[in-house]
Amino acid sequence: MNWITNYVRPRINSMLGRREVPENLWIKCPETGEMVFHKDLEDNKWVIPASGFHMKMPAKARLADLFDKGEYEALQQPKVAQDPLKFRDSKKYTDRLKDSRVKTDQEDTIVAGVGKVRGLKLVAVVHEFNFMGGSLGIAAGEAIVKAFERAIAEKCPLVMFPASGGARMQEGILSLMQLPRTTVAVDMLKEAGQPYIVVLTNPTTGGVTASYAMLGDVHLAEPGAEICFAGKRVIEQTIREKLPEGFQTSEYLLEHGMVDMVVKRHDIPDTLATLLKILTKAPANDVSAKSLNGAAAPLVANG
């Protein structure tokens, strides 16, 4: 062995050898196939620049983007029983929870915070879809109820950003019990005279759609979001008929009066601020139509 084999050859091999590239370095647009560098996607609020396709946005990133200067008080995750049913399918439920916590750096699917949007104080609640599909379980239900209680105590509006596959099957009937619990929480906020706005994101389905996601005073939706109770494939297999093109999308639901506005992600903070000033009866000179005019679709009155 000599310096050629000890030094030169390893250097050449390292230069010519295959380098490992992280899987998430480039993101592919599901609509056009365009490849976008992950940093560019994050800087553009997880919206594909060319196609305008709205990718799923991490919950903490959404809160930071929503609140003025990214500043807010994070609400603590309530302590609840872990795996009360001792559920196990192909994998232990506790192991699924551990994997999701490592993946998302969250205790469960709900992240909530108190802060200001264009100077207006509010509580925001966001689902993290990457945590077991944003499913609604005991922990998520308790976090949502606590967020509503905080909004009532602070005498401020609450804005919900659902992104969920529905009730968490690993918690059975205990998961389904969160539907009436969260519904009661919505009623409590309305009785307190505070507005409740829902921003429907992709996807919003199942028991979440059947409860607090469709109980807002105003419903906004991001472009192209899937919003439904049962999925398109399940319905088609049940009725044995082909459903219309674009069925269960934000735009389809807007046309049929199920949502009030379809709003691009970049316009959401301004639109929320304008709507909340109207709903809270702020002085007329404080209310601007600028954000509403910049929305993807006009405000539609239902009924």
UniProtKB/Swiss-Prot annotation:
Biological processes per GO annotation = fatty acid biosynthetic process; malonyl-CoA biosynthetic process
Q: Does the keyword tRNA processing apply?
A: no
Q: Which domain of life is it from?
A: Bacteria
Q: Which SUPFAM superfamilies match?
A: ClpP/crotonase
Please name the GO terms that the record assigns under molecular function.
Answer: acetyl-CoA carboxylase activity; ATP binding; carboxyl- or carbamoyltransferase activity
Which pathway does the protein contribute to? Answer: Lipid metabolism; malonyl-CoA biosynthesis; malonyl-CoA from acetyl-CoA: step 1/1
> In which compartments does the protein localize?
Cytoplasm
Q: Which family does it belong to?
A: Belongs to the AccD/PCCB family.
Q: How does it assemble?
A: Acetyl-CoA carboxylase is a heterohexamer composed of biotin carboxyl carrier protein (AccB), biotin carboxylase (AccC) and two subunits each of ACCase subunit alpha (AccA) and ACCase subunit beta (AccD).
Protein name (record): Acetyl-coenzyme A carboxylase carboxyl transferase subunit beta
The top of its lineage is: Bacteria, Pseudomonadati, Pseudomonadota, Alphaproteobacteria, Hyphomicrobiales
